[in-house]
């Protein structure tokens, strides 16, 4: 990494390779530090779009076990870390592919139990994850 990794590190200042390295290291952190096991005990695929594609920060597609991150929407390292942890959490949630839509209809997006859990996991672990990234990248 060219810059010191801090909360406010601008994602747009990083190369595609650096952004992917961060994404994979966050996956490693979730799996090995937080002990979160994704569906089938296999890492989900990771696709990072460097340019703006949507208004959301990321999404998880359960049918193909794919985490998509929209890096241009994640202005800072803090938002990027939150988003990757959040979407990785979805890859670990049982029945997410079956019940997600019905829960969204019943509770709404913001009160969907899958979303509540993913936001909580990201919020509780973002600081330690950023510290992990600083150590992993020698900063």
Q: What do these predicted regions represent?
A:
Residues 83, 87-95:
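Catalytic glutamate of the conserved HExxH
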Residues 32-41, 98, 129-136:
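Surface-exposed helix-capping loop/turn segments at secondary-structure junctions
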Residues 40-41, 45-66, 75-78:
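Catalytic zinc-binding patch centered on the HExxH motif and its immediate surroundings
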Residues 67-84, 108-110:
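Short pre-active-site segment immediately N-terminal to the catalytic Zn-binding motif
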Residues 5-8, 65-71:
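Short, aliphatic-rich beta-strand segments
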Residues 78-79, 93-122, 131-134, 138:
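Post-HEXXH active-site segment of zinc metalloproteases
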Residues 15-41:
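Zn2+-dependent metallopeptidase catalytic core
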Residues 2-12, 18, 123-139:
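Charged phosphate-binding loop/patch that engages nucleotide di/tri-phosphates or the phosphate backbone
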């Amino acid at each position: 990494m060219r810059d010191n990794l801090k909360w406010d590190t601008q994602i747009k200042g990083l190369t595609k390779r650096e952004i992917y390295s961060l994404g994979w290291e966050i996956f490693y952190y979730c799996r090995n530090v937080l002990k979160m096991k994704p569906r089938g005990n296999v890492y989900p695929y990771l696709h990072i779009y460097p340019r703006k594609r949507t208004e959301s920060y990321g999404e998880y597609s359960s049918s193909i076990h794919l985490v998509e991150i929209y890096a241009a929407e994640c202005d800072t390292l803090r938002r990027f870390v939150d988003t990757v942890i959040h979407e990785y959490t979805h890859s670990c949630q049982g029945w997410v592919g079956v019940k997600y839509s019905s829960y969204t209809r019943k509770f709404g997006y913001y009160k969907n139990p899958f979303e509540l859990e993913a936001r909580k996991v990201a919020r509780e672990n973002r600081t330690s994850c950023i510290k992990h990234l600083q150590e992993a990248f020698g900063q």
